[in-house]
Amino acid sequence: MRNICVIGSCSMDLVVTSDKRPKAGETVLGTSFQTVPGGKGANQAVAAARLGAQVFMVGKVGDDHYGTAILNNLKANGVRTDYMEPVTHTESGTAHIVLAEGDNSIVVVKGANDDITPAYALNALEQIEKVDMVLIQQEIPEETVDEVCKYCHSHDIPIILNPAPARPLKQETIDHATYLTPNEHEASILFPELTISEALALYPAKLFITEGKQGVRYSAGSKEVLIPSFPVEPVDTTGAGDTFNAAFAVALAEGKDIEAALRFANRAASLSVCSFGAQGGMPTRNEVEELLS
């Protein structure tokens, strides 16, 4: 069993389902409303745990009922919460999600996630006895992402930086990350002067650009490779990217080569969109391996 440390956001998702996505100034009727645990960090932690890794979640929640529910959900999914801390007088992070026409739109309120400082994250990393892979995203302070990538680089700990939500990154942070996994929109923010192919060629076997139902694209050095996704009828795409990143982390930590790891991650992500909720459809190890066989 590999040890994976996820440093990132934990939130409660407030999910509205509608037949139509509202335009600016428009009011539409929804068909359902649910609250489900989410946050990119928590989603990736749960997905990695279901795929068989021992997962340590490093993050913060508010001192509210959402925070309690988030912690209970992590524990119920086998995620270690030794390095999770409630923040007094602060609300838990929330994500406000509209599901319509098989896709989603999301507004994130950081809440306690904004209190994850570099010192807090690095202290947790130093205490975990052995880390095979670190996963980090951008729903936490920018300086924390920068310092964690720098620490991992200097200590030879592989780290996947999932640069979502999109924002520009310092060049040294890009250099310090072992792997970068933006989607097409995020890649355009990271590399505004480059085409997709130019960016991939600049970072072979480091930059992996996810393209939704098309799959994931990367440079193998001498050629550009597209690993196709597995075709499914999506119910809820909210957790697909998080499942992809978690599965990619697990596969790499287990020693799979890049192409095999990407195929594993694509299959896991495809399965994840077949049920409601960011975490609801996240598959087990057996489910992914059955699809691969």
Curated annotation (Swiss-Prot):
State where it is primarily located: cytoplasm
Is-annotated flag, keyword Kinase?
A: yes
Q: Where does ATP bind?
A: 183, 210-215, 241-242, 266
What detail does the entry give on cofactor binding?
A: Requires a divalent cation, most likely magnesium in vivo, as an electrophilic catalyst to aid phosphoryl group transfer. It is the chelate of the metal and the nucleotide that is the actual substrate.
Molecular functions (GO terms)? ATP binding; metal ion binding; ribokinase activity
Main role? Catalyzes the phosphorylation of ribose at O-5 in a reaction requiring ATP and magnesium. The resulting D-ribose-5-phosphate can then be used either for sythesis of nucleotides, histidine, and tryptophan, or as a component of the pentose phosphate pathway.
Family the entry assigns:
Belongs to the carbohydrate kinase PfkB family. Ribokinase subfamily.
Q: Could you identify this protein by its name?
A: Ribokinase
Q: What is the organism of origin for this protein?
A: Bacillus subtilis (strain 168)
